[in-house]
Amino acid sequence: MRLRLFLAASALALLSGCAGLTSHEALEGQGDAQTWKTHKQQLSELDAWQIDGKVGIRAPRDSGSGTLFWLQRQGYYDIRLSGPLGRGAARLTGREGAVSLEVAGQGRYQAESPEALLEQQLGWRLPVSHLLWWVRGLPAPDSKSRLTLDADSRLARLEQDGWQIEYTRYAEQNGYWLPERLKLHGQDLDITLVIKDWQPRQLGR
C-alpha cells in the first residue's frame, strides 16, 4: 500500500512539474522541464518591448541586410526595416484585423493580416504572428512545435509550422533572459536577427 501511495504521489509530482508544457510541445535537449516551464511563464507575461538591431534576409529573388526597430505594446506593433534588399525603408504597423505596410517610394497598403500583406507586397512568406513569440524565445502557442533546450533550459532550437529557428545567444535584460541572436529558416526565406538593444516591459500588470 505504501509503495502504491509513493508511486501515485511521484506521478502527480511529475505531472504538476510538466503542467506548463502544452500538448503541442515536444521537448528535447539537455535542459530541465521544470526550469523551462518557469522561464516560459515569465516570458509569456512579457507584453511590451522595444528592440533595436540588425536583420539579414535571403529570399529567392533578392537578399540584403538592414536595421530593425520593433515597438510592441500588447496587441499593437510597429516594426520598421531600413535598408534591406535595396527597398529603402519599410514600416509594418497594426493590430489584429487591421494591418498597414508603408514602403518607401511605393506607397501604403492595408490588409487584415501581416502575413497576407508581406506576401502580396514583398513576396515574403513570413509568419509575423508567430514572430511575436519566437523573438522572445518561445513557441507560438496555437500549433505543434518541437523544442530543443540548451544547458540553461532555454530554447536552442525550435521547429514549428515548417520553420526552424536557431537561438545562438542570450542576454539578461531587466530580469529576463532574451535572445540576442537567432536564425530563422523557412521554405524560401532565411532571416538572421541580431538584437543590439532589448527594452522589455510588462503593461498588463
UniProtKB/Swiss-Prot annotation:
The keyword Ligase belongs to this UniProt entry's keyword annotation: no
Gene Ontology cellular-component annotations: cell outer membrane
Lipid linkage positions (S-diacylglycerol cysteine): 18
Domain of life (superkingdom): Bacteria
Gene name of this polypeptide: lolB
Keywords: Cell outer membrane, Chaperone, Lipoprotein, Membrane, Palmitate, Protein transport, Signal, Transport
Description of how the protein assembles with itself and partners: Monomer.
Coiled-coil region(s): none
Role: Plays a critical role in the incorporation of lipoproteins in the outer membrane after they are released by the LolA protein.
Membrane topology, from the record: Lipid-anchor
GO biological process: lipoprotein localization to outer membrane; protein transport
Signal peptide: 1-17
Subcellular location: Cell outer membrane
InterPro entries: LolA/LolB/LppX, OM_lipoprot_LolB
Protein name as catalogued: Outer-membrane lipoprotein LolB
Lipid-bearing positions (N-palmitoyl cysteine): 18
The keyword Membrane appears for this protein: yes
Similarity-based family: Belongs to the LolB family.
